[in-house]
Amino acid sequence: MENQINVGIIGAGAMGLLYAANFADKSKLTLFTHRKEQADLLNQKGISLIDNETTKNIHIHAAQITEEEQLTKQQLLIIAVKQYSLNEIIPILQKLPTKIPILFIQNGAGHLERLSELGTTRTILLGISEHGAGREDDTTVIWRGHGRTKYSIFQGELNDDLKELLTSSPAFPIEKHANYQAIIQEKLFINAVINPLTAVLGVQNGKLLENQEWHRLLIRVVNEVETVLPIENALEKVETICRTTALNFSSMALDCMNERMTEIDGIVLPILEKGDKTETSLPTLRTLYQIIKGLEGERHV
């Protein structure tokens, strides 16, 4: 395809690798990594995308995040790092030309309070990913669950080429929504229930429905979160995700198992703070938060 758009993806974890693999054929793609060794490996080997029983190798161009000249060439940047890595990424984005639109696809809502640091003249898109993915190594990603990417314009506007690029394809559906708060709140709600429960229990998502006591606990957390973050058919939506991703471990469960820092402050803390403002008690959710923060403290992550 001629005149392909320069798309940069920042972050080469599970989501970054998955999005790079899917954008590689419809854009001139650069995947920006934290470590030079990973960029070198990706340039040599490409991305191995494992989907069910098939493995596909996709050749891509990778560069280290410190290569500012490469960043300034991009016509769209997709930010695929975890919430806690934004402290490192925001200062880099601040230096870039304001004409480059930025799409955030973080879990949680912690990143929303950072957007003002990018000014008011830049086009900013807020998105969520329904895909499940797991990174096996620096160049291999397993596509654990197919879903959609939903995005909304927070500020600014997109040109026609970018609108076309962000149009749905059957293999990798993308949907534009009018209200960014609605799509982020729904994903935040689901993550705030499933992630901490599976992380504390160390189980796959489906176990929250199979085990009667854990299912009661799930219902209790749903009822608590609903008091400060109401969404339609909340329990049904949470249970549907547990069912469709039954064999998957949530990202937070995997982080705890691998003794990594979690996104608990980006996912659960905003809900607890909302509860504090309205003097609403969220005892079960707060307990889950304290357990996970305590585990992080024990591991010094």
UniProtKB/Swiss-Prot annotation:
UniProt keyword Transport, yes or no: no
List of catalytic residues: 187 (proton donor)
Pathway: Cofactor biosynthesis; (R)-pantothenate biosynthesis; (R)-pantoate from 3-methyl-2-oxobutanoate: step 2/2
Enzyme category, top tier: oxidoreductase
Gene3D superfamilies tied to this protein: N-(1-d-carboxylethyl)-l-norvaline Dehydrogenase, domain 2, NAD(P)-binding Rossmann-like Domain
Compartment annotation: Cytoplasm
Ranges in coiled-coil conformation: none
Catalytic activity, EC: 1.1.1.169
GO terms assigned for molecular function: 2-dehydropantoate 2-reductase activity; NADP binding
Keyword Plastid: no
Catalytic activity from the UniProt record: (R)-pantoate + NADP(+) = 2-dehydropantoate + NADPH + H(+)
UniProt-listed NCBIfam families: apbA_panE (TIGR00745), PRK06522.2-4 (NF005093)
Family indicated by similarity: Belongs to the ketopantoate reductase family.
Job description of the protein: Catalyzes the NADPH-dependent reduction of ketopantoate into pantoic acid.
Name listed for the protein in its UniProt record: 2-dehydropantoate 2-reductase
Organism expressing this protein natively: Listeria innocua serovar 6a (strain ATCC BAA-680 / CLIP 11262)
